[in-house]
């Protein structure tokens, strides 16, 4: 990344306004898009694995399929659900990541 240059502009009222020069840097845009893509994937995994876990539990309670393989499926989808939830929780704790990518 290049150096950030701050340009000062004097307004009619005499106040000085500053503006950073590299606001539309390609690296910052790509970095922000990568972070958004990770969040979208984690959210999709959270929803899909949660739905699969619920459906597996319903099938297990109804007795529609053998218990062994279905119990493993429930355990793996629950683990994946918790992993995606952790990713989203960590991202939620760092709410300033969007603001840090665009410092205009």
Swiss-Prot record:
The protein, known as: Inclusion membrane protein F
Gene name per UniProt: incF
InterPro entries: IncF
Organism: Chlamydia trachomatis serovar D (strain ATCC VR-885 / DSM 19411 / UW-3/Cx)
Keywords: Host membrane, Membrane, Secreted, Transmembrane, Transmembrane helix, Virulence
Gene Ontology cellular-component annotations: extracellular region; host cell membrane; pathogen-containing vacuole membrane
Membrane-related topology note: Multi-pass membrane protein
Localization of this protein: Secreted; Host vacuole, Host pathogen-containing vacuole, Host pathogen-containing vacuole membrane
Broad class of where this protein is predominantly found: secreted
Highest taxon above the source species: Bacteria
Transmembrane segments: 39-59, 70-90
Any Pfam family hit: IncF
Reported function: Inclusion membrane protein probably involved in early modification events of the chlamydial inclusion.
Record flagged with keyword Transmembrane helix: yes
């Amino acid at each position: 990344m290049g150096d950030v240059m701050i340009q000062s502009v004097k307004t009619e009222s005499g106040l000085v306004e500053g503006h950073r020069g590299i606001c539309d840097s390609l690296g910052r845009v790509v970095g922000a898009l990568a972070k958004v893509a990770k969040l979208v994937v984690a959210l999709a995994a959270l929803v899909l694995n949660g739905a699969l876990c619920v459906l597996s539990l319903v099938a297990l309670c109804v007795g529609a399929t053998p218990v062994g393989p279905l119990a493993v499926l429930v355990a793996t989808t629950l683990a994946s659900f918790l992993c995606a939830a952790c990713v989203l929780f960590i991202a939620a704790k760092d709410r300033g990541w969007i603001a840090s990518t665009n410092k205009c």
